[in-house]
Amino acid sequence: MYTSGYAHRSSSFSSAASKIARVSTENTTAGLISEVVYREDQPMMTQLLLLPLLQQLGQQSRWQLWLTPQQKLSREWVQASGLPLTKVMQISQLSPCHTVESMVRALRTGNYSVVIGWLADDLTAEEHAELVDAANEGNAMGFIMRPVSASSHATRQLSGLKIHSNLYH
């Protein structure tokens, strides 16, 4: 069968255009890794901050993955929070040493709009970079939940800049 050079050029142009569109889309999409430090005695504050975002992400066709240390998500809580029960997955009783590794693998797949993991210790620079790369690759969000007790919150030194009042008088 004979095909004209024009027809061949047209099909190669469309495949090149789709490749350029895919590359430009990949370059403009970005993931996000964020650490959320919250007081264990005030979990409602964290819910007030994160629930609107999680509800919005629940409108996507992708899953939400919760990597929880011990607690199991309550079906009633998920529904009452306005999260899509059919899109929420949970893995519980995951040891902290496997949480970062599991988050990286899940974020990289692109199957999850958000991956939430609980860690008591700070991330190393290498772990953070690995999570950021995975979130960018999967165009997903990752939240590291870091609980602090009320007593440690009251005794730790706050980081910030102290402005002396004599600068203003």
UniProtKB/Swiss-Prot annotation:
Top-level taxon of the source organism: Bacteria
Region of interest called Lon protease binding, as start-end residue ranges on this chain: 162-169
Spans traversing the lipid bilayer: none
Site (Essential for degradation by Lon protease): H169
Keywords for the protein's UniProt record, in alphabetical order: Cell cycle, Cell division, DNA damage, Septation, SOS response
GO biological process, one term: DNA repair
InterPro entries: Cell_div_suppressor_SulA (IPR004596), P-loop_NTPase (IPR027417), SulA_CellDiv_inhibitor (IPR050356), SulA_enterobact (IPR047696)
Coiled coil: none
Post-translational modification (record): Is rapidly cleaved and degraded by the Lon protease once DNA damage is repaired.
Induction: By DNA damage, as part of the SOS response.
Residue span of region FtsZ binding: 106-112
Entry's family note: Belongs to the SulA family.
Subunit details: Interacts with FtsZ.
Summary of the function given for this chain in its UniProt record: Component of the SOS system and an inhibitor of cell division. Accumulation of SulA causes rapid cessation of cell division and the appearance of long, non-septate filaments. In the presence of GTP, binds a polymerization-competent form of FtsZ in a 1:1 ratio, thus inhibiting FtsZ polymerization and therefore preventing it from participating in the assembly of the Z ring. This mechanism prevents the premature segregation of damaged DNA to daughter cells during cell division.
Name recorded for this polypeptide: Cell division inhibitor SulA
Source lineage: Bacteria, Pseudomonadati, Pseudomonadota, Gammaproteobacteria, Enterobacterales
Gene coding for it: sulA
